[in-house]
């Protein structure tokens, strides 16, 4: 494989996460504008995230088998066509039902592309290089989540209608399409053939890592989703100031992924997993117990930094459980992570209603604690001793 082709495929992986990040963040940002457009309340618009997440969940689930039937290149080209159809549908639709269908289609595209992006990195690179590039790939989700709100805010400020945000997001997939038609995917055809011929045996750590992915994402989103309301209602902090907590978390999260992508090769991944989950659990507890807003700002920035590499390390460790990680193995972790996202408000909303915001954040902290416990189990249960 030529170096230029490898770079092109790597950028497809980067942009696949950027596409999903922009889609998720922008949809939440313009929900008020969308509800006004369709003359609905904000609560009635909540099904947008349900359809979007359902699309991502379904596509990641079926892509494990789809990849053995349809080549990666054809999937990406077909996904580009679906993106065009969905964006045009969003622009032209005049009912919330049609809008929800188009969001489901974008969710399908997002899930397929993200799983392909992860699969590409795990098969192009190995060892510490794989871990570093998976972290760098994941950082494009956060980077896109920072850039596109600025673009969207500019469009809305200029009185440009909200659906232009989705047209801009579609431009990311145009870049993916251009890279796809100019790249060779022959290496992956051989890999998928080999995975059919040799049955992959998964050890118990694969199950533990899958559960870790679900609990980590559920704990993270359950925490960060309710932090603004917690700071406002429990801490009596001005609503404008609470935004700095969330933005500080995601900024340090992105910087943390960049930092760990460079230093991860010097450490054992199993021990790094234990260290980061323990630090994150302690920092989250300190945030919840703190009664000083300035301290909370420092703590949540530290939390974002130390928790940034956990999910990618889970994916990397899963890929190292077998000699030749299959699409099914990688998609299993992504599937459990997506289930965690899907369950966030389904699980946390009843807790908020019944027990309050404090108990909800404590519940997220407990989930982080369980992931820390699982990281220790995974360390002692590892099948292969690898220093990475």
UniProtKB/Swiss-Prot annotation:
InterPro entries: MFS, MFS_dom, MFS_trans_sf, MFS_TsgA, MFS_TsgA-like. It is found in: Cell membrane. Belongs to the major facilitator superfamily. TsgA family. GO terms for molecular function: transmembrane transporter activity. It is a multi-pass membrane protein. It comes from Buchnera aphidicola subsp. Acyrthosiphon pisum (strain APS). GO terms for cellular component: plasma membrane. PANTHER family: L-FUCOSE-PROTON SYMPORTER (PTHR43702), PROTEIN TSGA (PTHR43702:SF3). It comes from the Bacteria. Keywords: Cell membrane, Membrane, Transmembrane, Transmembrane helix. It holds the Pfam family MFS_1. This is Protein TsgA homolog. The chain crosses the membrane at residues 11-31, 50-70, 77-97, 101-121, 133-153, 160-180, 206-226, 244-264, 268-288, 298-318, 332-352, 360-380.
């Amino acid at each position: 494989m030529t170096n230029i082709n490898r770079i092109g495929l790597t950028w497809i992986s980067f942009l696949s996460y950027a596409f999903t990040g922009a889609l998720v963040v922008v949809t939440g940002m313009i929900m008020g504008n969308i509800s006004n457009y369709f003359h609905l309340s904000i609560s009635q618009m909540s099904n947008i995230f349900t359809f979007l997440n359902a699309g991502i969940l379904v596509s990641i689930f079926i892509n494990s088998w789809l990849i053995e039937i349809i080549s990666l290149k054809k999937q990406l080209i077909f996904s580009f066509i679906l993106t065009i159809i969905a964006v045009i549908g969003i622009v032209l639709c005049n009912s919330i039902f049609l809008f929800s269908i188009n969001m489901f289609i974008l969710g399908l595209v997002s899930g397929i592309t993200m799983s392909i992006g992860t699969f590409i990195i795990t098969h192009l690179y190995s060892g510490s290089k794989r871990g570093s590039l998976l972290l760098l790939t994941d950082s494009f989700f956060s980077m896109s989540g920072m850039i596109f709100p600025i673009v969207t805010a500019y469009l809305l400020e200029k009185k440009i209608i909200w659906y232009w945000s989705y047209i801009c997001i579609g431009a990311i997939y145009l870049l993916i399409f251009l890279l796809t038609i100019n790249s060779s995917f022959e290496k992956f055809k051989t890999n998928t053939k080999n995975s059919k011929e040799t049955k992959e045996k998964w050890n118990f750590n694969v199950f533990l890592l899958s559960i870790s992915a679900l609990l980590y994402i559920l704990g993270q989103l359950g925490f960060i989703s309710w932090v603004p309301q917690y700071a406002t209602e429990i801490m009596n902090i001005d609503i404008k100031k609470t935004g700095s907590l969330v933005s500080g978390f995601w900024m340090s999260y992105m910087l943390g992924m960049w930092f760990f992508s460079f230093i991860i090769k010097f450490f054992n991944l199993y021990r790094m997993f234990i260290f980061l989950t323990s630090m994150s659990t302690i920092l989250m507890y300190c945030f919840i117990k703190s009664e000083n807003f300035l301290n909370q700002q420092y703590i949540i920035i530290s939390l974002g930094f130390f928790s940034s590499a956990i999910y990618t390390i889970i994916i990397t460790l899963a890929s190292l459980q077998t000699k030749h990680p299959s699409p099914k193995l990688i998609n299993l972790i992504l599937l459990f992570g997506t289930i965690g996202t899907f369950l966030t408000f389904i699980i946390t909303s009843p807790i908020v209603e019944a027990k309050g915001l404090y108990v909800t954040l404590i519940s997220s902290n407990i989930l982080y604690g369980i992931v820390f416990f699982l990281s220790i189990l995974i360390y002692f249960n590892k099948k292969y001793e690898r220093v990475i």
